[in-house]
Swiss-Prot record:
NCBIfam families: PRK11750.1
Principal cellular location given in the protein's record: plastid
Gene3D superfamilies per UniProt: Aldolase class I (3.20.20.70), Glutamate synthase, alpha subunit, C-terminal domain (2.160.20.60), Glutamine Phosphoribosylpyrophosphate, subunit 1, domain 1 (3.60.20.10)
Protein name: Ferredoxin-dependent glutamate synthase
Cofactor or coenzyme needed: [3Fe-4S] cluster; FAD; FMN
Binding positions for [3Fe-4S] cluster per the UniProt entry: C1162, C1168, C1173
Cysteine pairings via disulfide bonds: none
Enzyme class, broadest EC rank: oxidoreductase
Gene Ontology biological process terms, A to Z: ammonia assimilation cycle; L-glutamate biosynthetic process
Location of the active site: C34 (for gatase activity)
Molecular function, one GO term: glutamate synthase (ferredoxin) activity
Entry-linked InterPro entries: Aldolase_TIM (IPR013785), ET-N_metabolism_enzyme (IPR050711), GATase_2_dom (IPR017932), Glu_synth_asu_C (IPR002489), Glu_synth_asu_C_sf (IPR036485), Glu_synth_centr_N (IPR006982), Glu_synthdom (IPR002932), Ntn_hydrolases_N (IPR029055)
EC number(s) reported in the record: 1.4.7.1
Length: 1538
């Protein structure tokens, strides 16, 4: 039936049509998260109860999933079990089919196209017969279709099972054969282009396991598949999975489990993993597959989800002979480099080192549950970013789950409780009846082969070579080289020289306000067309400074070995600790045992840019030939002894990308590494681009030469001698530059949530703005370029233009300064130019329409700067009278200001903005940092001069004004987030990212932390405050859903908004946010302002809001989610025209940041980050704040102008309101009057050729539905106790489905009494397993006690009261190391007490401000970013204690004498308890802990106090170094014995 040759040679683009995901959308537009777990009987006793327990566990994690637009079709639920042979035998009796359980029988679980059953089954049967497998029969799976949601029902496949048998193969060999069968079936369907391919999917084909899954809610799975509740359906294990997808169209194959794994999380490095897997395929050889290995290819598929591709990689390794544990260790390795637990197990480190040269990690937050039917296990990602709790029972069950309490276990039956830490694994071998912990698994796997010896034989570690100590060219030649390669004066002075001096990237402010590179009239180097992507919502960014233990820039170069080799041999290779190498190190690589060749990237200008493409293709041929000649290091070099006007360098990024993809296509990519020796690489963004498109290392020889010249400059030496620059020698200057680049690279990796350079390498995690398909397909295939742009000839022309400037007849003594960063007359156009600012100030200071018209004209007649400048309005309606248009009051209600924090801004500015917005009925945004409760009051004491005793520092006030920000922001630092703050908001904004620095945190310098700011932020004056890059309670989409739930819980009247930054794929993220119950989604553009950000982030991260807004609006509309949310946009909005254009693209509300500040008095000095703002807008210095002249009326006037302009445009279009034009894309057309300098290839289809969907406008606030707090509040005694401030005690049972308990009570108390005014006492006792966020935002006067256990986020944001958690009565553990609460507890707490008789998970007390707590063990990153409070840990601690901790104290009991190695000593120091005050503080907390929990550990310590006290360490940040508790000098008593 098959032409085997054709099948074997099936092109990848055809085989990608296979259903294994033919129905799946692009990997860039698919995200998911989930709840996952397994139950396994260690003794391999099969029973129906395990299946039922798995189904019940699924139901208990329903809140971790989501539903489609019909609110009934689940995103996916499923289970994997052993094959229920008894059920199948009885079911097939009527077909006279018999087989024994131990026979070599395989079962396939199939989704088939209902209208092509015969054809699809014939293909399956034909392949089985070709592989000499006997077809026993078919079984129609009994289902109940009526229980499905509408969308799931309409897309439901035909579900049937096939049974096959081998007469001569063992079960293990048959399992491998079935893998081959499935790949052949999929390949055949793909190559023949079956139009039903998207309806065909093989859930499982195995003789050990079977998968039941579909697009349904948890509770529906067992109702739909009748088998699952059949008493004969027995299994000794079950894996279960509930999916939360950002994409909402039902896709049955996307439900999990996959065939081997169930995955909760996201693989950030997917595109790179897929590229490298494709490049690895030619090397794959295996004794298992022999000459049939080609039939398994392609291994992965770019059209599949990350989970499906990870499953495919795992499946390959397992089917080729690896154990499941080893397969996951290879693909998802632990962060072994800084693991003290491996200090005495070098074989484990050797294993990971060995495979780091063969397989780049699949990196990202992930809990991966896996099975091959014999071993069931789970592993966690290297950062521990997903929860994983386990229970081992006395009757030999092992239960692992995303949450504790999903499977009911009697307390007396619990043997132990624990959690998986970062990179850890647990497995159950049901055939040998063993439970293996992390160390046992990894020791077993790694001791089989002497990996250390293999490394010693094959690996060379590149030693550091000294930097050059002399200049290599004179200043004239240097300037000519710099000019030829595109350097400007700003690149040298602001970037390279700053990095050489300070060893860090330059910081800038106020955002990017110049034209996009493709719109600019000035030439740009190729890197400027690339925008870095970043993590938001579906996975977290990482802090590369505070969590450096999981980060690495190491990379290995040379020929790669065969990943499937069962007797590993390692090719010769070199390990680089950094991809940034100097000239000496490059020479050392040439002198190594590897075969290296330098390939010149210069081309002759014979035909001008016309031969540009041919020259690049020739370069690619040269590269492949070099490999065929035996070279395994290719150095692409633009270095030339003499600069020649007729020899132009191919841009190194273009050269690298083209060669990289050419070698992949030729099957040669694994044979060699690409290095780059280039002059055109100096900023961190340049390095990131080169590495992202395949370069393993870069020698930036001209950047180093520039640093040498800077150091040699007499001016530099003079500044050093006067102490105005740090002193260094010429080699240190180059080392500083390299250090700055490396730090910047780590930040770029980490903003995407990637830890390892080897995972970023070749991952192409960029978005292109301004390159056409010809360029992209040649060198950057797989990268999105939404708007098209330069052709090869046009790119060649720009390259030549840059080069030719070096040979201009005009001679200058300085490099050209085009003003790309700082405004300069005659330079690049800046929207925020002095002329514009002056016109705006004149207009708003007195409401002067003439000046506003001038302002408006300046912006309307500007050069094309943003994408919207290429559009114009059209309407088929006749103009109407402006009197028919909605009132200006209605329009003003749609306006907001951006989230600018009090701390970054002065108090005067912040309050003036809020008052102005409240006057017009708009909304100001508090930003991060809290708000003074005095601002919640309405002013009624304003005198005739416009001042008020309540706010005496403000001018221009009126009675009735209020300075309260309507929008209160919740950012990653949680500074000032208290119950009272949250209750005084009309909206609560979760800031996921910021336009000017997406994927990054922030730091408010100590000089901006005045006593007033410190009071609001619950910290100490003068101490720097760090906002983490991620929210530590948002590592996935279901985590965001939980925070939205928390905020709806405390303030059910406030709308919840989620702020995202525009990037490719934002539409699917927004879909997840909408399904997570958000009320508002805000899309910020890349050009938003900021108080401080790395310059490379301002310039090279994020994309225009026009693209993001259009994508979000379209996708939500297409998936019937548009009516669930309001869309808001911000980023560079300045005129009424901007508002109308944004509305047409889908926006309903509009945010103003920079321009609002200008209207209020900002003069764009662009020194916000220095605390030296000359007009008092962005400073905390009192003498500068006194200069602030702004009044609310100025901003009111600005918005009146904007509102009137909107009304005029609406009238001219013939529309009566903004609502009437929202999403009406037909009103936009391309402005053909604009001719761009560089290209006519811009494509605006994503903005103008869109279906005009209709939807019901969303106005209400989403609710959480029935919650436990409402039941508690419904009890009269409770409501009376709140009203009368009396004391009451109540008792309740609790389950993991009861989330955020105690929070709504706290909101009511805070609303009525503030944070501290309640005098009553409400005691609530709970029994069972509490859901997430137990006691979140707890208010003073509420004491919660839990007899049981709790999940993540206990005490998050608590402000008062107490939380006590103890094991349930009757619990007897075999050891004292029991986990009782989850991850990220006490996050952002501003007060209160927490006592937990057991261990906590990762990131305990992260960003704690004032809470005090005692626990009996913690995971990694305890006390991270802590600014106050006291923490006591009476047990083991994980790694990285005290990272970023700037305040508060912590005490750790160190019985194992290993605590010192677990502390991050960058900021804190540790010491013994050396003062009486410190001893009393510690002892008092332990006494409280003993009294409240009955802790045996606490009682033992107190009884033997004198012997235990010397075993405690005190963790002390600098701000606490001179207080009674830490310093004998300040304490009346010291402890002599210590």
């Amino acid at each position: 039936m098959f032409n085997q040759k054709i099948v074997d040679q099936a092109p990848r683009k055809l085989t990608s049509r296979l259903t294994n995901s033919s129905s799946l959308i692009s990997i860039e537009k698919e995200r998911d998260a989930c709840g996952v777990g397994f139950i396994a009987d260690v003794n391999n006793v099969a029973n129906h109860k395990i299946v039922v327990q798995a189904l019940e566990a699924l139901t208990c994690m329903e809140h971790r999933g989501a539903c489609s637009a019909d609110r009934d079709s689940g995103d996916g639920a499923g289970i994997t079990t052993a094959i229920p042979w008894n059920l199948f035998q009885k079911s097939l009796q009527n077909q006279n089919i018999k087989f024994e359980q131990n026979d070599s029988v395989g079962v396939g679980m199939l989704f088939l196209p209902a209208h092509k059953l015969k054809e699809s089954k014939l293909i399956i049967e034909t392949v089985l017969k070709e592989e000499n497998l006997e077809i026993i029969g078919w079984r129609l799976v009994p289902t109940v279709q009526e229980v499905l949601g509408k969308q799931a029902y309409l897309n439901k496949p035909h579900v049937e099972q096939v049974f096959c048998k081998s007469s001569n193969l063992s079960k293990d060999r048959l399992e491998q054969q079935l893998f081959l069968v499935r790949k052949k079936i999929e390949k055949y369907i793909g190559i023949n282009g079956k139009d039903w391919a998207h309806e065909f999917y093989i859930c499982s084909l195995s003789c050990y396991t079977i998968v039941y899954k579909g697009m349904m809610r948890s509770a529906v799975l067992g109702q739909f598949y009748q088998d699952l509740y059949h008493s004969e359906y027995t299994s000794s294990f079950a894996i279960y999975h509930r999916r939360f997808s950002t994409n909402t169209m039902p896709k049955w194959p996307l439900a999990q489990p996959m065939r081997f794994v169930s995955h909760n999380g996201e693989i950030n490095t997917l595109l790179g993993n897929l590229n490298w897997m494709q490049s690895r395929e030619p090397l794959l050889q295996s004794k298992v597959w022999k000459d049939r290995i080609h039939e398994l290819k392609p291994i992965t598929n770019k059209d599949n989800s990350d989970s499906a591709n990870l499953d495919a990689a795992v499946e390959l390794l397992i089917a080729s002979g690896r154990s499941p544990e080893e397969a996951l260790m290879i693909l998802v390795p632990e962060a072994f480099q800084n693991q003290p637990d491996f200090a005495n197990n070098t074989e484990i480190s050797d294993f990971y080192e060995y495979y780091s040269g063969l397989q780049e990690p699949w990196d990202g937050p992930a809990l991966v549950v896996f099975t091959n039917g014999k071993v069931i296990g789970a592993t966690l990602d290297r950062n521990g970013l997903r929860p994983a709790r386990y229970v081992i029972t006395k009757d030999n069950l092992v239960i692992v789950s995303s949450e504790s309490g999903v499977v009911q276990v009697e307390p007396g039956n619990v043997k132990s409780k624990g959690r998986l830490g970062p990179g850890q694994m647990i497995s159950v071998d049901i055939f040998s009846h063993k439970i293996l912990n992390n160390k046992e698994i990894k020791t077993s796997v790694t001791t089989k082969i002497p990996y250390g010896e293999l490394l010693t034989d094959a690996r060379q570690i590149l030693e550091h070579k000294p930097f050059l100590s002399d200049q290599q060219v004179d200043i004239k030649k240097l300037m000519q080289l710099q000019t030829a390669f595109g350097y400007t004066n700003e690149d040298v002075e602001l970037v390279i020289e700053h990095m050489a001096s300070q060893a860090k990237e330059p910081t800038f402010c106020m955002g990017d306000d110049i034209p996009l590179s493709i719109l600019s009239e000035k030439s740009h180097i190729l890197y400027d067309y690339f925008k870095q992507r970043f993590a938001q919502v579906t996975n977290p960014a990482i802090d590369p400074l505070r969590e450096s233990l999981v980060m690495s820039l190491a990379i290995q170069i040379g020929h790669k070995s065969n990943l499937l080799d069962d007797q590993p041999t390692l090719a010769k290779h070199i390990k680089l600790e950094s991809p940034v190498i100097n000239e000496g190190e490059l020479n050392a690589i040439f002198e190594s045992k590897l075969s290296c060749i330098r390939i010149n990237t210069l081309f002759q200008l014979e035909d001008g840019p016309k031969n540009f493409k041919q020259q690049i293709q020739q370069l690619c041929e040269n590269a492949s030939q070099a490999i065929l000649d035996g070279n395994n290091i290719l150095v692409l070099s633009d270095k030339n002894n003499s600069l020649d006007s007729e020899k132009v360098s191919i841009p190194p990024l273009l050269a690298v990308g083209a060669v990289h993809h050419h070698l992949i296509n030729k099957g040669l990519r694994q044979e060699a590494s690409i290095l780059v020796e280039t002059a055109q690489c100096w900023s961190t963004h340049h390095f990131a681009c080169l590495i992202g498109y395949g370069a393993s290392a870069i020698c930036p020889y001209l950047a180093f030469e520039t640093a040498r010249h800077w150091w040699s400059n007499p001016k530099t030496k003079m500044l050093m001698s006067k102490g105005r620059l740090p002193a260094c020698n010429i080699q240190e200057a180059q080392a500083n530059y390299k250090k700055a680049v490396e730090a910047g690279l780590l930040k770029i990796l980490s903003k995407m949530g990637i830890s390892l350079l080897s995972s970023y390498h070749g991952a192409q995690i960029f978005e292109i703005l301004g390159l056409g398909s010809e360029v992209v397909n040649l060198a950057f295939k797989g990268t999105t370029s939404q708007i098209g742009g330069l052709s090869m000839i046009e790119l060649g022309r720009e390259t030549v233009n840059i080069h030719s400037k070096a040979f201009s007849e005009v001679k200058t003594k300085k490099l050209a300064n085009y003003g790309f960063v700082q405004y300069r007359p005659g330079g690049e156009y800046h929207i925020n130019n002095p002329e514009m600012s002056k016109a705006l100030h004149q207009a708003v200071r007195g409401y002067n329409p003439e000046y506003y018209n001038n302002y408006q004209s300046l912006l309307q007649n500007r050069p094309p700067t943003a994408l919207r400048d290429l559009l114009k309005l059209q309407s088929n309606r006749a103009p109407i009278s402006i009197d028919e248009v909605e009132s200006i009051e209605d329009i003003l209600q749609k306006f907001c200001t951006g989230g600018m924090s009090l701390g970054a801004l002065s108090r005067e500015t912040h309050e003036t903005l809020a008052i102005a917005m409240n006057r017009i009925g708009g909304k100001s945004n508090s930003g991060e940092g809290g708000e003074d409760p005095v601002r919640f009051k309405i002013l009624n004491d304003v005198n005739s001069s416009g001042t008020s005793p309540l706010l005496p520092h403000l001018k221009g006030l009126k009675n009735g004004d209020t300075a309260s920000s309507a929008i209160k922001q919740i950012a990653s630092g949680r500074f000032g987030v208290t119950p009272e703050y949250l209750m005084n908001a009309k909206q609560l904004e979760i800031k996921i990212a910021q336009g000017a620095k997406p994927g990054e945190g922030g730091q408010l310098p100590g000089k901006k932390i005045s006593p007033y700011i410190a009071t609001l932020r619950k910290c100490k004056p003068g101490v720097p405050l760090i906002s983490p890059p991620p929210h530590h309670d948002i590592y996935s989409i279901e985590d965001l859903s939980q925070l939205i739930f928390d905020l709806h819980q405390i303030n059910p009247k406030a709308k919840i908004s989620v702020k995202l930054v525009s990037e490719i794929g934002i539409g699917t993220i927004a879909a997840g946010v909408a399904k997570g119950n958000a009320d508002i989604i805000q899309i910020s553009g890349h050009d938003g302002g900021t108080g401080a950000s790395p310059l490379s982030s301002i310039k090279h991260a994020g994309s225009p809001w026009e693209l993001g807004l259009s994508e979000v609006h379209q996708l939500l509309a297409e998936n019937q989610l548009r009516d669930r949310v309001t869309l808001r946009v911000d980023g560079g909005l300045r005129t009424g025209s901007d508002i109308v254009l944004a509305a047409i693209m889908g926006a309903e509300e509009f945010g103003f940041g920079t321009v609002a500040m200008i209207a209020t008095g900002c003069i764009m000095a662009r020194i916000c980050h220095t605390n030296k703002c000359p007009v008092g807008v962005a400073t905390q210095r009192e003498e500068l704040r006194a200069r602030f002249s702004g009044v609310p009326e100025a901003l009111v006037n600005f918005f009146l102008f904007i509102g009137n302009e909107v009304r005029e445009i609406l009238a001219s279009l013939g529309y009566k309101s903004l609502d009437d034009i929202t999403g009406q894309n037909h009103l936009l057309i391309k402005n053909t009057d604009i001719n761009l300098t560089k290209t006519n290839g811009i494509q605006l289809d994503t903005l103008i050729n869109i279906n005009n969907n209709t939807w019901t406008k969303f106005n209400s606030v989403h609710t959480n539905g029935p919650v436990m707090d409402d039941d508690i509040l419904a009890i009269p005694e409770v409501s009376n106790a709140i009203k009368l401030e009396t004391e009451i005690t109540k008792h309740f049972k609790i389950a993991n489905t009861n989330r955020t308990v105690g929070t709504r009570l706290s909101g009511i108390i805070a609303k009525n009494y503030g944070n501290t005014g309640f005098k009553g006492l409400i005691k609530l006792n709970f029994y069972g397993s509490a859901g997430q966020s137990f006691g979140a935002f707890l208010a003073s006067g509420i004491n919660l006690k839990l007899m049981g256990e709790a999940n993540d986020y206990v005490g998050k944001g608590m402000n008062g009261g107490s939380i006590v958690i103890v094991p349930p009565a009757g619990t007897i553990y075999e050891d004292n190391n029991q986990v009782i609460i989850g991850n990220t507890c006490l996050y952002g707490a501003t007060g209160g007490y927490l006592f937990a008789q057991g261990q906590a998970g990762e990131r305990f007390a992260v960003r704690n401000s004032l809470a005090e707590s005692v626990v009996e063990g913690v995971g990694d990153h305890a006390c991270e970013y802590m600014t106050g409070g006291v923490i006591v840990v009476l047990g083991k601690a994980g790694r990285n204690v005290g990272a970023g901790m700037t305040g508060g104290l912590a005490y750790f009991l160190d019985e194992d004498e290993n605590f010192i190695d677990r502390v991050n000593s960058e900021i804190v120091k540790i010491q013994r308890v050396i003062t009486k005050a410190g001893e009393e503080q510690l002892k008092n907390l332990i006494e409280n802990h003993a009294a409240k929990t009955g802790s045996l550990k606490a009682h033992t310590i107190l009884e033997k106090w004198n012997s235990y006290l010397p075993q405690f360490w005190q963790v002390v940040p600098p701000s606490e170094a001179n207080i009674d508790e830490t310093n004998p000098t300040y304490s009346s008593n010291t402890i002599a014995a210590c």
